Amino acid sequence: MWVALKRFGFLSGLLALTVLSACSAFRKPDKFEGYYINNIPGSAEIDHANYDLTFFLGFFNRIEKTEKDKSQIDFGSIHGTGWLIDWKEVDKKDKKANKFTVYLATNLHVIQALKNREDHPPYNQFDINFVRTVDFRIGKYTDVKQFVAPSKLGLPNSTQAFVAAQPTVLPKTAFIAHDFVNYTLSKDQKNKKQREQQWKVQIKPNKDEVHPYADSAVLELPLFLNNSSDRQIFDHFIQPAIRAYKQLGDSLNIFAYPTLDQFKHSHYYVLGYPYIAKKLPTLFVNQTGKEKTVPGETAQIPNDQPFVSTINEEGPHLGRIKSDKFNGGTWAWNHDNTKNFPFNRQFRGKEYQMYGKGIGITNGSLSRGASGSLVLNNKRQIVAIYFASRITETQEWGLAQLLRWKPRSVLNEEKDSVAYDLIFGNSNTKKYYAQFAKK
């Protein structure tokens, strides 16, 4: 079955397999008249920083189903969007490996598709005997000539395409927002009203309670710069993202820290890779040669050809809000996840429910596959992470989870959920990204 990865038919089918995304739970399929599709933002637009920071993430899994001594093998994929949140330079003491590590923020419901036996504990403790990730791609809509001379593929020199690049190894899980505040819900609640109001301080850990999660996670992707494909990913994807990150103010200034009343005064910019039933020129950038062995990592399976160009009937397109003068979407409302979007999930035998605050953004809804997109405000600060869309007959909104917020002391704004900080932490937050980054 591994040989199938080397066939052109498998490559061309990678972007057309079953696609799962929480965004699709709210979104009418493939409605994109109000958006720019495969339109790279100009350098003066706020969306250009968003474009540089943002990538397609594709997890392609092998699924083995066993029934009465019969095995059936299927392939499925989960696509999402991620963005640069951090990086680790090459260790000067280990120049032979020449490893540069990239950290990409996305939704928790996207990263849960990763099934890597070499993942960090406890994320390698899933039952992955029958489901495993066999191919991972990081992608972007860009100029083909950045990766290969278009003439070698019979293409015009100005050709732009969706580029899906295969790194040397599978990524790992750096951080997920499970149990990020010290609150739980009673397991034996009888109705929704109780569920909204009974988050209580957890005195002792109890797996039978309902635990909080935020739809936020961080992926760790090693790039080995002696490898030609990894070097191209670094040069043409990651370096522009690092420059954009620094131009926005670097880590101390790039993340907004607002009060809940401040959101209504801003415009918001959402850019991602929604999955659309529209023809898509695609360039696959592949690992080639012999299968590699990398200690502590899961090496990806090489292909016969370093570059494969194709036209897919549908796939992940670069999408962004089409608004007057590129001024983004406006604030629609603040919401409490427990009240408005009580999503549930299981992890290591425990039940979790979505927790925290978020905002609705007018004209900010993108199709499935845009899950994990960053949300920039008009001050060029990151305020939230996009996780779903909501559609009515007359209106549509993008939904985003706040990454950090602070309460106003004179108001009872923490009645439903306490103020938290998933990036740097605060007195309420017991699990946040900076803890991992310091290790």
Curated annotation (Swiss-Prot):
Protein family per UniProt: Belongs to the MG067/MG068/MG395 family.
Main location: membrane
UniProt keyword terms in alphabetical order: Cell membrane, Lipoprotein, Membrane, Palmitate, Signal
Pfam hit, one: Mycop_pep_DUF31
Transmembrane segments: none
Name assigned to this protein: Uncharacterized lipoprotein MPN_582
UniProt entry tagged with the keyword Transcription: no
Residues with lipid group (S-diacylglycerol cysteine): C23
GO CC terms: plasma membrane
N-palmitoyl cysteine: lipidated positions: C23
Signal peptide: 1-22
Top-level taxon in the UniProt lineage: Bacteria
Location of the protein in the cell: Cell membrane
Topology in the lipid bilayer: Lipid-anchor
